[in-house]
Amino acid sequence: MAEALTHEQIAEFKEAFSLFDKDGDGTITTKELGTVMRSLGQNPTEAELQDMINEVDQDGSGTIDFPEFLTLMSRKMHDTDTEEEIKEAFRVFDKDGNGFISAAELRHVMTNLGEKLTDEEVDEMIREADVDGDGQINYEEFVKMMMSK
């Protein structure tokens, strides 16, 4: 998992890790994990932190070593990239930038992608993703649709 990180990212993570490894023994406590991640621009909730700690801290020692930390951060970085890609895709579909994808916008983009859809097919796609029933797709609905694929 950690192979997906660049040398610069690994160096940055090592520097942050070292700042919180107070006694220099090569481990940080689970309590400090949140502080480290926030210093690197991540914003995990308490529940997310607990989940991450449970995943990484196999022996229940309450500490995380650097290889475990790298694995954790590469997962978080991957999640962030995915979210950014979804935002970018939403912007492509949302031609007028109003925060919603209309049937006309969906049809336009799908046609440009080489997908010749009937009005019924476009309406069906909108209906499937349109949780609140307003006839268009907002960002939250788009994310749900993309994540369910």
Swiss-Prot record:
Record has Acetylation as a keyword: yes
SMART domains: EFh, efhand_Ca_insen
Pfam families (alphabetical): EF-hand_7
Positions carrying N6,N6,N6-trimethyllysine: K116, K149
Chain residues that bind Ca(2+) 1: D21, D23, D25, T27, E32
Gene Ontology CC terms, in alphabetical order: myosin II complex
Ribonucleoprotein listed as a keyword: no
UniProt binding sites for Ca(2+) 2: D57, D59, S61, T63, E68
Gene3D superfamilies: EF-hand
GO MF annotation, one: calcium ion binding
Keywords: Acetylation, Calcium, Metal-binding, Methylation, Repeat
Binding site for Ca(2+) 4: D130, D132, D134, Q136, E141
InterPro entries assigned to the protein according to its UniProt record, in alphabetical order: CALM/Myosin/TropC-like, EF-hand-dom_pair, EF_Hand_1_Ca_BS, EF_hand_dom
Domain EF-hand: start-end pairs: 8-43, 44-79, 81-116, 117-149
SUPFAM superfamilies linked: EF-hand
N-acetylalanine: residues carrying this PTM: A2
Residues holding Ca(2+) 3: D94, D96, N98, E105
Function: Calmodulin mediates the control of a large number of enzymes, ion channels and other proteins by Ca(2+). Among the enzymes to be stimulated by the calmodulin-Ca(2+) complex are a number of protein kinases and phosphatases.
Similarity remark: Belongs to the calmodulin family.
Additional comment: This protein has four functional calcium-binding sites.
PANTHER family xref list: CALMODULIN LIKE 3, MYOSIN LIGHT CHAIN 1, 3
UniProt protein name: Calmodulin
Organism, scientific name: Euglena gracilis
